[in-house]
Amino acid sequence: MSAQLINGKEVSQKRLQAVAEAVAQRQQDNLHMPCLAVVLVGGDPASAVYVRNKKTACQKCGIKSLSYELPESTSQEELLALVDRLNADSEVDGILVQLPLPKHLDSQAVLERISPDKDVDGFHPYNVGRLAVKMPLMRPCTPKGVMTLLEAYGIDPKGKKAVVVGASNIVGRPQALELLLARATVTVCHSATENLADEVAGADILVVGVGIPNFVKGEWIKPGAVVIDVGINRLDDGSLCGDVEFETAKERAAMITPVPGGVGPMTIATLMENTLHAASLHDA
């Protein structure tokens, strides 16, 4: 029997609508309009698409967006100076620096320069640390989006065995913290993990984010598992696929996210929620 598809597009539209309603209510209450500043360095085509999608989401929600498109040659000092200006600008609630940055720039130093209360991506060590001690402030967008999807489909991680494949700072590590916060029993797999197939086979909830097409084989999936595929990879023929071998996995899983249309839309919806949350922090 084929798995039920987890429709991220549908869930994200509901979340965006809720943000739009909250923004409209803020206007009625004479509170300031939330504002997101997006910084793009260089001309990476995929990054340009992501930035465009974020601007579109802002328009849907009534969130003001400011765009800063900097040349590839931008220096570390110039980028940090822009972040400092945005930190000091009381009109700006959220700051997003689109990753990856050109190789000559230090991404970590840039992310750490963003004020934690404006870190709507949730990448600042302060925000990851707060998540680790069960006091989240700004939650990383993709992991929080995954948790929103699970909630929307009535999947409670409490007491379940959750396996996260991939240990990146953007997805894997904060995803493990989110699942731990939801009281799952969490295993994190990475490049040094032995017997990956055995680890995957024990998962009630499987979250994969490694950036390698079809990395997790369908036959590894535990029958009845919930599979969340965070990967999005473009193949030589131009088609998109995830990190999980979809066609075989959907014959074993109970529920699975498609690629595209699964986790991706949730990341942007969560970004809008975080920007709204940041605005509320700045009301006082």
UniProtKB/Swiss-Prot annotation:
<keyword id="KW-0658">Purine biosynthesis</keyword>
<dbReference type="GO" id="GO:0004477">
    <property type="term" value="F:methenyltetrahydrofolate cyclohydrolase activity"/>
</dbReference>
<dbReference type="InterPro" id="IPR036291">
    <property type="entry name" value="NAD(P)-bd_dom_sf"/>
</dbReference>
<keyword id="KW-0368">Histidine biosynthesis</keyword>
<feature type="binding site">
    <location>
        <position position="191"/>
    </location>
    <ligand>
        <name>NADP(+)</name>
    </ligand>
</feature>
<keyword id="KW-0028">Amino-acid biosynthesis</keyword>
<comment type="similarity">
    <text>Belongs to the tetrahydrofolate dehydrogenase/cyclohydrolase family.</text>
</comment>
<keyword id="KW-0560">Oxidoreductase</keyword>
<dbReference type="InterPro" id="IPR020630">
    <property type="entry name" value="THF_DH/CycHdrlase_cat_dom"/>
</dbReference>
<comment type="function">
    <text>Catalyzes the oxidation of 5,10-methylenetetrahydrofolate to 5,10-methenyltetrahydrofolate and then the hydrolysis of 5,10-methenyltetrahydrofolate to 10-formyltetrahydrofolate.</text>
</comment>
<dbReference type="GO" id="GO:0035999">
    <property type="term" value="P:tetrahydrofolate interconversion"/>
</dbReference>
<comment type="pathway">
    <text>One-carbon metabolism; tetrahydrofolate interconversion.</text>
</comment>
<dbReference type="InterPro" id="IPR000672">
    <property type="entry name" value="THF_DH/CycHdrlase"/>
</dbReference>
<dbReference type="InterPro" id="IPR020867">
    <property type="entry name" value="THF_DH/CycHdrlase_CS"/>
</dbReference>
<dbReference type="Pfam" id="PF00763">
    <property type="entry name" value="THF_DHG_CYH"/>
</dbReference>
<feature type="binding site">
    <location>
        <position position="232"/>
    </location>
    <ligand>
        <name>NADP(+)</name>
    </ligand>
</feature>
<dbReference type="InterPro" id="IPR046346">
    <property type="entry name" value="Aminoacid_DH-like_N_sf"/>
</dbReference>
<keyword id="KW-0521">NADP</keyword>
<dbReference type="GO" id="GO:0006164">
    <property type="term" value="P:purine nucleotide biosynthetic process"/>
</dbReference>
<keyword id="KW-0511">Multifunctional enzyme</keyword>
<dbReference type="GO" id="GO:0009086">
    <property type="term" value="P:methionine biosynthetic process"/>
</dbReference>
<dbReference type="Pfam" id="PF02882">
    <property type="entry name" value="THF_DHG_CYH_C"/>
</dbReference>
<keyword id="KW-0486">Methionine biosynthesis</keyword>
<dbReference type="InterPro" id="IPR020631">
    <property type="entry name" value="THF_DH/CycHdrlase_NAD-bd_dom"/>
</dbReference>
<keyword id="KW-0378">Hydrolase</keyword>
<feature type="binding site">
    <location>
        <begin position="166"/>
        <end position="168"/>
    </location>
    <ligand>
        <name>NADP(+)</name>
    </ligand>
</feature>
<dbReference type="GO" id="GO:0004488">
    <property type="term" value="F:methylenetetrahydrofolate dehydrogenase (NADP+) activity"/>
</dbReference>
<comment type="subunit">
    <text>Homodimer.</text>
</comment>
<keyword id="KW-0554">One-carbon metabolism</keyword>
<dbReference type="GO" id="GO:0005829">
    <property type="term" value="C:cytosol"/>
</dbReference>
<dbReference type="GO" id="GO:0000105">
    <property type="term" value="P:L-histidine biosynthetic process"/>
</dbReference>
<protein>
    <recommendedName>
        <fullName>Bifunctional protein FolD</fullName>
        <ecNumber>1.5.1.5</ecNumber>
        <ecNumber>3.5.4.9</ecNumber>
    </recommendedName>
</protein>
